[in-house]
Amino acid sequence: MHTLIERLEKVTNSKELEEARLNALGKKGVFADKFNQLKNLNGEEKNAFAKEIHHYKQAFEKAFELKKKAIMELELEERLKKEKIDVSLFNAIKTSSSHPLNYTKNKIIEFFTPLGYKLEIGSLVEDDFHNFSALNLPPYHPARDMQDTFYFKDHKLLRTHTSPVQIHTMQEQTPPIKMICLGETFRCDYDLTHTPMFHQIEGLVVDQKGNIRFTHLKGVIEDFLHYFFGGVKLRWRSSFFPFTEPSAEVDISCVFCKQEGCRVCSHTGWLEVLGCGMVNNAVFEAIGYENVSGFAFGMGIERLAMLTCQINDLRSFFETDLRVLESF
């Protein structure tokens, strides 16, 4: 049993220490074997041998605790040396990425501004004329029900789309006009694909009658969608908007399933991304324009961001969950 303590003194790490403990104190260790031998002894011989075993066992346990403490201190010192931090080193500041909505806005602006489109900014609070009537949406028009919004006592309202900026621009400027506007809009909706506040981008081009045709609109839209989404397929569908005539909606091939069919595209292989059309003459008449033509288009910025970031719940953009926002 003297050799147990001698072996313990040669231990240099935690693994060897545990092996020495099991060899001495384990169920099949040296001391367990010695205690089993007591059943073969009788009388004084048994008592003397039992005292001797206890003596060496206590001596080993004491030596083990001392060795354990020494090894723990040694390993801690070695670990601290390896993990030592030089406080004089420059601490790199963690840089965050752009919010998905800001990234989408900037990408849109980067496409249109080199083409001569001027970025216009409008008020969030509008009157009925600029938000509805001037856009061929007279009182009690059924299309107003789709744009239920927040009203104030003085007949003002939070704008339901960015189209009022087009009206203000035409009132303040004369053709030719090339403009885009981006900003917040408000409607009484809240679900997976709608929030009470959301962002839109709209574009308007106006010039002398005959200078602007639907083919110009088609070229701009197709160039933008290929720039934004890459090599997607496009599908044009006739539609209706009170402020454009003719009107169209544009779909892109599903970026999730590559037109194989999935829940996002309702197994059609297509995703709606924007609406557009030639500006309705009723809009020009409300402004006082004569002998002009033009086109307009609009799309939801959240919609574009959801498709590029592959997000199913629009509300994720506004919940300030860093785990979500830092994943883009």
Curated annotation (Swiss-Prot):
Binding sites annotated in the UniProt record for Mg(2+): 245
One Pfam family matching this protein: Phe_tRNA-synt_N
Listed EC numbers: 6.1.1.20
InterPro entries per record: aa-tRNA-synth_II (IPR006195), aa-tRNA-synth_II/BPL/LPL (IPR045864), Phe-tRNA-synth_IIc_asu (IPR004529), Phe-tRNA_ligase_II_N (IPR004188), Phe_tRNA_ligase_alpha1_bac (IPR022911), Phenylalanyl-tRNA_Synthase (IPR002319), tRNA-bd_arm (IPR010978)
GO cellular component: cytoplasm
GO terms classed as biological process: phenylalanyl-tRNA aminoacylation
Localization (cell): Cytoplasm
Recorded catalytic activity of this chain's protein: tRNA(Phe) + L-phenylalanine + ATP = L-phenylalanyl-tRNA(Phe) + AMP + diphosphate + H(+)
Keywords: Aminoacyl-tRNA synthetase, ATP-binding, Cytoplasm, Ligase, Magnesium, Metal-binding, Nucleotide-binding, Protein biosynthesis
Primary site of residence: cytoplasm
Cofactors, names only: Mg(2+)
Subunit structure: Tetramer of two alpha and two beta subunits.
NCBIfam families named among the record's database cross-references: pheS
Name of the protein described by the UniProt record: Phenylalanine--tRNA ligase alpha subunit
Species of the source: Helicobacter pylori (strain J99 / ATCC 700824) (Campylobacter pylori J99)
Gene from which this protein is expressed: pheS
